[in-house]
């Protein structure tokens, strides 16, 4: 095994209370279930989660919501997980709802080292509250700040021992993106291949972005 190979129970050494975690996937598809479960089992709390949605009660990052491990949430959609809505209304979770495209670009900006992005999305709505507005060529834009995280957890359908990754269909959602914007990136890989077995033109996330690999099996 390479130095990037991480046993699941060794994930705990990268976790601490109050940390920020980005996650890939869409409605739980493409979210690394084993990594989520290990985070839950570790007992860490007061987490900030950044990702597209909170999936369902027992899917994706849902178990972290249900078991009161999350303090803050930056996401686009919470409607399929009723526990998220309940905890938001009760004041148990601070939820920042962000339009999906804006969320993606804020993460991308964080990964690219940019100071933010300008978008017309949300101008004239509650989304603009507390944000700087900039006018360019007669059109108003919101300045949206970049997003970064302590770790990103992603799920790949296959990858090699160096950490080059490929995804399957819609399971690709947000996974390559969050890998750009975290200090430490941990990938759950279903099919782990020897170096050279993954064709270069299939690689979506290059090994340089991956710190650790955890086998799904």
Swiss-Prot record:
Pathway: Lipid metabolism; short-chain fatty acid metabolism
The protein's assembly and partners: Heterotetramer composed of two alpha subunits (AtoD) and two beta subunits (AtoA).
Entry similarity comment: Belongs to the 3-oxoacid CoA-transferase subunit A family.
The protein's Enzyme Commission number: 2.8.3.8
Family annotation (PROSITE patterns): COA_TRANSF_1 (PS01273)
Disulfide bonds: none
Known function: Coenzyme A transferase which is involved in short-chain fatty acid degradation and catalyzes the activation of short-chain fatty acids to their respective CoA thiolesters.
Pfam family, any one: CoA_trans
Annotated positions binding CoA: 24-30
This protein's UniProt keywords: Fatty acid metabolism, Lipid metabolism, Transferase
KW NADP (keyword) present: no
Known catalytic reactions: an acyl-CoA + acetate = a carboxylate + acetyl-CoA; acetoacetate + acetyl-CoA = acetoacetyl-CoA + acetate
Gene that this sequence comes from: atoD
Gene Ontology MF annotations: acetate CoA-transferase activity; CoA-transferase activity
InterPro entries xref list: 3-oxoacid_CoA-transf_A, CoA_trans_fam_I, CoA_transf_BS, NagB/RpiA_transferase-like
Enzyme class: transferase
Protein name: Acetate CoA-transferase subunit alpha
GO biological process, one term: short-chain fatty acid metabolic process
